[in-house]
């Protein structure tokens, strides 16, 4: 299983010291006040997740990891699934969000709760509490909202928020709906403070303006100084944000991104990212991370850091069994141990997805082969050879494999049993060139 340790086991004196070392804090309220809150008696904290898609992604995973660190230290988590704010959407850096139907948002909210519940403890003294801001927002009239909440917000301060200011200066501008989002989020913090004495909110660094709205509101109407902190935004090698709206999301839901592909995402990260990713996305002790980083520098070909990272994050999100299945599938694919026949159909399809070809309609599909078709024809269809004669030469030299079994006969045909899960036949040329055909 993934290593999940509290700050003392990880080699740190305080929780804040660990979070800072791991690069999990970008901005915060007064550091001494935050440190005192985290190091004292258990507090209640919250993080909001808007159901603007059917799954969370790795940008949200950073927040869940922060929540887990605090939970392990004995603090009490609240996961707010934004049944109300999810109907509106927080302002993006550019472009208005699409407003989704209420029933769709409600369905997504249920899925997000299940994902969060698979990562945070849902039982015990400090089990995660789930709330929806729809419960206290939906019944509020416009008059109540403007009188009781809106009057506490100054327009100048709201207009100065980074995202709002940027959108105001853009061609598309910003709607009143998205402009009001920060007021709703501020009211959420106030409600949770009143209801559960919640004194800390977590979020991504792009949420800083929304987080401070609640901070200022509580100070103004309750006279109490609470805390917020943000984590950095995760970017890819080109500096672009990993997220739903960027089109390259790494989803946490196994039905939207298989555990195999999730595992492959992490194991294929470059050496230069190992230190930051091991710190941020694993709970490994400081000494072990330092050892792995040094190993990646002195013996990069071993890829121990990448393998450890992929195991830790995938098992944290999807569990040990799914992670081991992903590893076994990868090994079986290239004939390095494990049996192709043992891979379930869903994992198999995910593993082979990269071997689709573009058909005459521009669609990515598996090339079709039927029982009785020659292996050399299937290999050509899979894009491994340009001609039958080229395929025959490769077979003669012992370099063609069907489901990891070497082909000896140039005229061998596919049998019903050659289609794994009744659907796929895997053909390999040499050690690394792979292709797949589908019986359909």
Swiss-Prot record:
It catalyses: tRNA(Tyr) + L-tyrosine + ATP = L-tyrosyl-tRNA(Tyr) + AMP + diphosphate + H(+). Residues 373-439 form the S4 RNA-binding domain. It is an enzyme of class 6 (ligase). It is found in: Cytoplasm. L-tyrosine binds at residues 46, 181, 185. Its EC number is 6.1.1.1. Keywords: Aminoacyl-tRNA synthetase, ATP-binding, Cytoplasm, Ligase, Nucleotide-binding, Protein biosynthesis, RNA-binding. GO terms for biological process: tyrosyl-tRNA aminoacylation. GO terms for cellular component: cytosol. GO terms for molecular function: ATP binding; RNA binding; tyrosine-tRNA ligase activity. Its main location: cytoplasm. A motif ('KMSKS' region) lies at residues 241-245. CDD domains: S4, TyrRS_core. It holds the Pfam family tRNA-synt_1b. A motif ('HIGH' region) lies at residues 51-60. InterPro entries: aa-tRNA-synth_I_CS (IPR001412), aa-tRNA-synth_Ic (IPR002305), Rossmann-like_a/b/a_fold (IPR014729), S4_RNA-bd_sf (IPR036986), SYY-like_C (IPR054608), Tyr-tRNA-ligase (IPR002307), Tyr-tRNA-ligase_bac-type (IPR024088), Tyr-tRNA-ligase_bac_1 (IPR024107). ATP binds at residue 244. Homodimer. Catalyzes the attachment of tyrosine to tRNA(Tyr) in a two-step reaction: tyrosine is first activated by ATP to form Tyr-AMP and then transferred to the acceptor end of tRNA(Tyr). Belongs to the class-I aminoacyl-tRNA synthetase family. TyrS type 1 subfamily. This is Tyrosine--tRNA ligase. It comes from Bifidobacterium longum (strain DJO10A).
């Amino acid at each position: 299983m993934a290593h999940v340790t509290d700050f003392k086991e990880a080699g740190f004196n305080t929780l804040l010291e660990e979070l800072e070392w791991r690069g999990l804090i970008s901005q915060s309220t007064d550091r001494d006040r935050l440190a005192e809150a985290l190091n004292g008696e258990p507090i209640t904290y919250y993080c909001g997740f808007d159901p603007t898609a059917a799954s969370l992604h790795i940008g949200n995973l950073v927040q869940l990891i922060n929540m887990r660190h605090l939970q392990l230290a004995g603090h009490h988590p609240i996961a707010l699934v934004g049944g109300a704010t999810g109907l509106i959407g927080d302002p993006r850096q550019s472009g208005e969000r699409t407003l989704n139907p209420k029933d769709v948002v409600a369905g997504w909210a249920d899925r997000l709760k299940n994902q969060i519940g698979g990562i945070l403890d849902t039982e015990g003294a400090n089990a995660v509490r789930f709330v929806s801001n729809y419960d206290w927002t939906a019944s509020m009239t416009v008059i109540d909202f403007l009188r009781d909440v809106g009057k506490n917000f100054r327009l100048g301060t709201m207009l100065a928020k980074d995202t709002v200011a940027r959108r105001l200066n853009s061609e598309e501008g910003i709607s009143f709906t998205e402009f009001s989002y920060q007021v709703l989020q501020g009211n959420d913090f106030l409600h949770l403070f009143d209801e559960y004495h919640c004194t800390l909110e977590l979020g991504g660094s792009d949420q800083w303006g929304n987080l401070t709205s609640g901070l200022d509101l509580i100070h103004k109407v309750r006279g109490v100084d609470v805390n917020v902190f943000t984590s950095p935004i995760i970017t890819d090698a080109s500096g672009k944000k990993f997220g739903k709206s960027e089109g390259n999301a790494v989803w946490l839901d196994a039905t939207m991104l298989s555990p195999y592909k999730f595992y492959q995402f992490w194991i294929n990260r470059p050496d230069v990212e190992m230190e930051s990713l091991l710190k941020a996305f694993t709970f490994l002790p400081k000494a072990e991370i330092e050892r792995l980083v040094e190993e990646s520098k002195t013996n990069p070909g071993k890829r121990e850091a990448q393998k450890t990272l992929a195991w830790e994050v995938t098992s944290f999100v999807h569990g040990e069994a799914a992670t081991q299945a992903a590893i076994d599938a990868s090994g079986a694919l290239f004939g390095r141990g494990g049996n192709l026949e043992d891979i379930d159909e869903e994992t198999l399809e995910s593993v082979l997805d990269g071997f689709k070809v573009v058909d005459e309609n521009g669609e990515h599909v598996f090339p079709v082969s039927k029982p009785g078709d020659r292996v050399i024809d299937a290999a050509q269809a899979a894009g491994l050879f340009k001609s039958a004669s080229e395929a025959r030469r490769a077979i003669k030299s012992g370099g063609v494999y069907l489901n990891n079994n070497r082909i000896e006969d140039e005229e061998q045909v596919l049998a019903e049993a050659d289609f794994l899960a009744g659907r796929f036949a895997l053909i390999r040329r040499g050690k690394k060139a792979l292709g797949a055909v589908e019986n359909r």
